[in-house]
Amino acid sequence: MSKKPRQIAFYGKGGIGKSTTSQNTLAQLATTFGQKIMIVGCDPKADSTRLILNTKAQQTVLHLAAELGSVEDLELEDVVATGFGGILCVESGGPEPGVGCAGRGIITSINFLEEQGAYDGMDFISYDVLGDVVCGGFAMPIRENKAQEIYIVCSGEMMAMYAANNIARGILKYAQSGSVRLGGLICNSRKTDREDELITELARRLNTQMIHFVPRDNVVQHAELRRMTVTQYNPEHPQANEYKQLADKILHNEKLTIPTPIEMDELEQLLIDFGVVEDEETAIKKLEAAGH
């Protein structure tokens, strides 16, 4: 009986750098730590595997199934591509905008992969999931007990933290009946004030850890323009070492918790305490001063 792979998922609001962070981290898990990895992209943008495959968007399960007639007509080799570090890549895809539910594509894809034995022999299955909305579809890797460990990519910006708290709420809902747990917050820095302290404090309140603080560096964008991870583009760069540290922490992470999401009032007060947003009194005083 082969060991079961660890099923992890990266969630985070759109534009936070979730796919970039996950691919850079997984590249290190594969190359430095010798882990066998499959990425299952669950974002309708289908960009969860671009930096591993060094290509534009990969053909998706839903698109290929539609071309052939149904998922039953697909073969595993039609949808699985091998990229940097031997990482296997699949994009579930999504429907045309305004039609249907993207979550259905995720469900269809994961069921197909499991039935075809795609997960056999893997150390990690990684789901890359849009996280602004934890609707039924996007919550599917959590809800169906597929993903066991959730990592939330966030920053010190208000909307990123708001999304992180919402995702924690979604995890809590399913953690009580299933085995899904929160593995930690990954701070993908936007260089906002006191960001490290702020996310550490948010993590504490959510009953988790800030597993790593990823500093902002232009080399990430330079690598992205070439459709590469930093590890492939410039393995000696200090930023590659940041992703190596994060990969190591995930590999050895034993702090898997049931989160304690906070109320909106508490989140807003936290942002005021750290100076991210002003309280009304300060804002009014500033406006009055500007008016004189």
UniProtKB/Swiss-Prot annotation:
Q: Name one GO biological process term.
A: nitrogen fixation
Question: Looking at its record, which EC class is this enzyme?
Answer: oxidoreductase
Q: Which residues form a coiled coil?
A: none
Recorded hits in Pfam families, A to Z, give: Fer4_NifH
Cite the EC number: 1.18.6.1
Q: Does the keyword Iron apply?
A: yes
What this protein needs as a cofactor is: [4Fe-4S] cluster
Q: Tell me where in this chain the PTM ADP-ribosylarginine is found.
A: 104
Cofactor binding notes: Binds 1 [4Fe-4S] cluster per dimer.
- Tagged with keyword Nucleotide-binding: yes
The family assignment reads: Belongs to the NifH/BchL/ChlL family.
Described by its record, this protein's role is as follows: The key enzymatic reactions in nitrogen fixation are catalyzed by the nitrogenase complex, which has 2 components: the iron protein and the molybdenum-iron protein.
For this protein, the record's PANTHER family field holds: LIGHT-INDEPENDENT PROTOCHLOROPHYLLIDE REDUCTASE IRON-SULFUR ATP-BINDING PROTEIN
Protein name per its UniProtKB record: Nitrogenase iron protein 1
Q: State the organism named in the record.
A: Paenibacillus durus (Paenibacillus azotofixans)
Which gene carries the instructions for this protein? nifH1
